[in-house]
Amino acid sequence: MKIGYLGPNESTFGYLAAEKFFDQVKKTEGLETGFEFTPYKNHNEVCYAVGSKEVKYGVIAVENVIDGVVAETIRAIDNIDGQFGLKVCAEVVVPIELFYMKKENNGALPKKLISHVVALRQCSHFVSKMQADGVAIELRDSTGAAAQEASTNPDIAVIASNNAAKICNLQILNKESVTDHKNSLTRFWIIGKEHANKTGKDKTCFLINLEQSVSGSLWKALGVFAERNINLLLIYPCPIPGKHWEYTFLIELRGYITDPGIIDAWSEFRKLGLSLNPPRFIGSYPDVTSQ
């Protein structure tokens, strides 16, 4: 069975998330055969691979406890779901530690520091100090891609995982993580073509495009869930490309798609006519983050 993740190799947190989740699946279900992990350049490519059935499942980062929602992921799901149909079927949490590393530990400052945008934001204090010292900051598609590039050039430093240092043969220059806050965690979604079976402790996600010209449209949309005592866990506005000040809202709530309260709320929302496009259900899956 093929599993897609953010590559280019096993040095990324996407790979660690995939390995963690599917190793547990293998143990739980007593599978004798393993999984084939396939790297992709970005989250959009992972989603496309799942939608086109190139792989069975994909693993994509959705939220970090420090940096918040990964907008790239929401846009990718919105785009590919509209073409092929995708479902979030599970979630897994991975601890995040980021380190400063180079090919050689020669004491010299690098000419540039590279990494994924989310990793750089999580290390903003360290990155600011590097900028003040004249080091150029550049973005790459993943921490793994950045580490791979740094392994070929001693003038380039990277912020990545300690796993990246091992795989790409880089020297970690700071023994401690350079993240702004310790105990960072990232939540990853497992995406496929079907949502998961009900467990009794679940989450459900929708994507909606609200009509901006209607007063109180967001309040009315959220109200259909609040009136039924359905707990909203996450509301995130993702800008729609080409439509200024228009948003696709990701709504994540506690419960399962077949729960009577959610069915009733979803039905009422659709009747209100607040959505520019048909609202979309993108998955119900076991809740692993709520206390």
Predicted regions and their residues:
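Domain-level signature for soluble enzymes in the chorismate/prephenate branch of the shikimate pathway
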Residues: 1-291
